[in-house]
Amino acid sequence: MKENKKSVSTRRASSHCKASKEKKEDFMMLPTVDFCFKELMQNDNIRKNIIAALLNVPPREVENTELMPTILRKESKDDKYGILDVRVRLKDGEQIDFEMQVEAFDCWANRSVYYLSKMYAGEIKEGEGYDCLKKCIHVSILAYDHFLDDKECY
């Protein structure tokens, strides 16, 4: 049986579509992509296990991980605006800021301290004592070596 050009062409196109579909099904977004990281951290179980690993405690001890707003609001017109990747409050009131950074950023340490200070300062209200302030933790997940000579950062 002799095939005509049209049937060969159709079969090739069909084969190409199948290969293209398989590539799409094999696609996996890396967790270093901001969107993917934020979506993963929406999962309570994943979030608790990451926090447990970072704090070096069993996951069952991480009882509550409330996601908080990530926008660091401006107090005045001239203030710097900030947006955290993922902000979590633990049961005891401590906060953790998770930041994913793929591209090297010269002022990363300064930015991290700025974010932490805004989180910390935002915890105390008028009339409260300073003893009510809770710990704020910053976690930088970097796809590059920021502290080349520092063996403590890993």
Enumerate the language-model features and the residues they cover.
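Elongated, amphipathic alpha-helical interaction scaffolds
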Residues: 1-154
